[in-house]
């Protein structure tokens, strides 16, 4: 599933292309993705300038001059790309936005877990995003904040940093990578972390996410940016997907465990409990 670095990469690839343009028409190739499209995707976003392209958590947001916003969630396999006027519609292209420069914005989603909404902009923070946690790359992620969230829960640290009500956008892959960099065992209870471990974890989360954004995100299967280019952070993965291979730090074997359908990768030597 695309996480914060992938959506940030998508935002960066689309921002300069879209600001100032106008959506002239919306074509739906099916009635629903995760939810029905017609009541959630309205015509208020037509014929008004695009003012901004931004990200909140794993949502891509396109703001319009009439105080409406288009909100996209890529789900498991979504792609949101700019295509030329002569583009031929593909099998899983579900929503087509015609732009006033004759290009097209295409939402493609093989597994159909993605979402495309339009709302009044002020509705987003008040109702839609109100229960989301803080952005991990912001100054709000501090020792005091994270410690206050850990101390009241008897949950493994990996699950805690993946909780979008605490920190947004740190999915399974980036949680595994961040914990390896911080040398913290993923199954260690969050409440048992010392202050220096929490500070090191915050630093590691930021470092991993920043490197992933610089590399254009991680493409394991479906992800591409707005120019249809894949991400290359895959080449920098230290533990994720490397079960049975040697740890780059100590040459111990990378282990894999599974919990609630999620795989966790770690080094038992570097990441002690």
Curated annotation (Swiss-Prot):
Active site location: 2-3, 58, 262
Pfam family, one: Fapy_DNA_glyco
Catalytic activity, as annotated: Hydrolysis of DNA containing ring-opened 7-methylguanine residues, releasing 2,6-diamino-4-hydroxy-5-(N-methyl)formamidopyrimidine; 2'-deoxyribonucleotide-(2'-deoxyribose 5'-phosphate)-2'-deoxyribonucleotide-DNA = a 3'-end 2'-deoxyribonucleotide-(2,3-dehydro-2,3-deoxyribose 5'-phosphate)-DNA + a 5'-end 5'-phospho-2'-deoxyribonucleoside-DNA + H(+)
Cofactor(s) required for function per UniProt: Zn(2+)
Keywords: DNA damage, DNA repair, DNA-binding, Glycosidase, Hydrolase, Lyase, Metal-binding, Multifunctional enzyme, Zinc, Zinc-finger
GO molecular function, one term: 8-oxo-7,8-dihydroguanine DNA N-glycosylase activity
E.C. number(s) listed in UniProt: 3.2.2.23, 4.2.99.18
Entry annotated with the keyword Metal-binding: yes
InterPro entries: DNA_glyclase/AP_lyase_DNA-bd (IPR015886), DNA_glyclase_Znf_dom_DNA_BS (IPR015887), Formamido-pyr_DNA_Glyclase (IPR020629), FPG_cat (IPR012319), MutM-like_N-ter (IPR035937), Ribosomal_uS13-like_H2TH (IPR010979), Znf_DNA_glyclase/AP_lyase (IPR000214), Znf_FPG/IleRS (IPR010663)
Record note on cofactor: Binds 1 zinc ion per subunit.
CDD domains linked to this entry: EcFpg-like_N
Record note on quaternary structure: Monomer.
Record-stated family: Belongs to the FPG family.
PANTHER family the UniProt entry points to: FORMAMIDOPYRIMIDINE-DNA GLYCOSYLASE (PTHR22993:SF9)
Role noted for this protein: Involved in base excision repair of DNA damaged by oxidation or by mutagenic agents. Acts as a DNA glycosylase that recognizes and removes damaged bases. Has a preference for oxidized purines, such as 7,8-dihydro-8-oxoguanine (8-oxoG). Has AP (apurinic/apyrimidinic) lyase activity and introduces nicks in the DNA strand. Cleaves the DNA backbone by beta-delta elimination to generate a single-strand break at the site of the removed base with both 3'- and 5'-phosphates.
UniProt protein name: Formamidopyrimidine-DNA glycosylase
Organism of this sequence: Rickettsia canadensis (strain McKiel)
């Amino acid at each position: 599933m695309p996480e914060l670095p992938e959506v940030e990469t998508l935002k960066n690839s689309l921002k300069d292309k879209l600001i100032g343009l106008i959506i002239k028409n919306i074509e739906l190739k099916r009635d629903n993705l995760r939810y029905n499209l017609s009541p959630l995707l309205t015509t208020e976003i037509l014929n008004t300038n695009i003012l901004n392209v931004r990200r909140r958590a794993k949502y891509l947001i396109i703001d319009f001059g009439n105080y409406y916003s288009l909100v996209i969630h890529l789900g498991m396999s979504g792609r949101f790309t700019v295509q030329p006027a002569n583009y031929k519609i593909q099998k899983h292209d579900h929503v087509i936005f015609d732009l006033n420069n004759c290009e097209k914005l295409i939402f493609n989603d093989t597994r159909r877990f993605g979402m495309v909404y339009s709302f009044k902009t002020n509705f987003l923070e008040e109702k839609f995003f109100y229960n989301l946690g803080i952005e991990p790359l912001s100054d709000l992620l501090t020792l005091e904040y994270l410690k206050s969230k850990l101390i009241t829960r008897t949950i493994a640290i990996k699950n805690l940093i993946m909780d979008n009500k605490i920190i947004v956008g740190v999915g399974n892959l980036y949680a595994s990578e961040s914990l390896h960099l911080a040398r913290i065992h993923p199954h260690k209870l969050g409440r048992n972390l010392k202050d220096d471990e929490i500070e090191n974890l915050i630093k590691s989360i930021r470092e991993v996410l920043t490197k992933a954004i610089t590399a254009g995100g991680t493409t394991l299967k479906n992800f591409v940016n707005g120019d249809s280019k894949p991400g290359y952070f895959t080449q920098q993965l230290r533990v994720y997907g490397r079960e049975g291979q040697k740890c780059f730090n100590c040459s111990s074997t990378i282990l894999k465990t599974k919990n609630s359908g999620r795989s966790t990768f770690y080094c038992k030597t570097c990441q002690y409990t």
